[in-house]
């Protein structure tokens, strides 16, 4: 969860979410960081407390009944997809199908390298995300999965329970052409950022074409 000035305690997220639900808000969203970037240290002089979004959302789930619990964005290259599938399905059952997962490759290569050290050398986060999305999709829809990719492998993996939500609601982040292709193939939504209204109109038209290529539509 991204640190903000008015949240001094991780449990403040629960109290804010309870109040948001009482006020009629639809959803709460959590960001995902494993490590502190250099520019953050320069700006703040210390490392902020980045809490786990999935664990925080699980706590919020126990204190709410209607709020959708969402990430924007969970960084897929940080995680082994087989283990993540289990965590997501468990959380979706705990919250009664309210989980919505925004995913991305991560904004900062520096953070990826901090987590993986020398093992990060030569790894392509976009390709890792493609494999993760394919694996998660299969694990959520197939009884048994064998997958051999460049970065991830599973063998005769039966991942149960499946999430309550079917199809599982992936929201794909990223402004790039690759991000849009992922959204068209796997997403129920696309999470871009920084576009003007005119640019966004053009991007939606491009996304519609990509969806048609996948046999899908904006409707």
Predicted regions and their residues:
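Active-site-adjacent structural elements that line small-molecule/cofactor binding pockets in enzymes
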Residues: 1-219
């Amino acid at each position: 969860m991204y640190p903000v000035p008015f949240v001094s305690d991780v449990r403040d997220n629960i109290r804010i979410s309870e109040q948001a639900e009482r006020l009629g808000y639809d959803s709460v969203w959590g960001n995902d960081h494993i490590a502190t970037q250099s520019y953050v240290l320069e700006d703040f002089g210390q490392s902020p407390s980045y809490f786990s979004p999935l664990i925080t959302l699980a706590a919020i789930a126990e204190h709410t009944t209607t709020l959708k619990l969402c990430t924007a964005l969970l960084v897929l290259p940080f995680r082994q997809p087989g283990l993540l599938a289990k965590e997501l399905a468990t959380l979706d059952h705990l919250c009664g199908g309210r989980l919505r997962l925004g995913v991305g490759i991560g904004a900062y290569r520096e953070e990826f390298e901090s987590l993986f050290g020398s093992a990060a050398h030569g790894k392509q986060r976009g390709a890792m995300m493609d494999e993760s999305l394919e694996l998660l999709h299969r694990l959520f829809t197939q009884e048994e999965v064998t997958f051999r990719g460049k970065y991830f492998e599973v063998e005769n993996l039966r991942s149960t329970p499946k999430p309550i939500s079917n199809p599982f609601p992936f929201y794909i982040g990223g402004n790039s052409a690759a991000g849009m292709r992922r959204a068209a193939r796997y997403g129920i939504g696309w999470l871009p950022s920084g576009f003007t209204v005119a640019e966004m109109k053009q991007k939606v038209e491009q996304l519609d074409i990509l969806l048609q290529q996948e046999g899908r539509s904006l409707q």
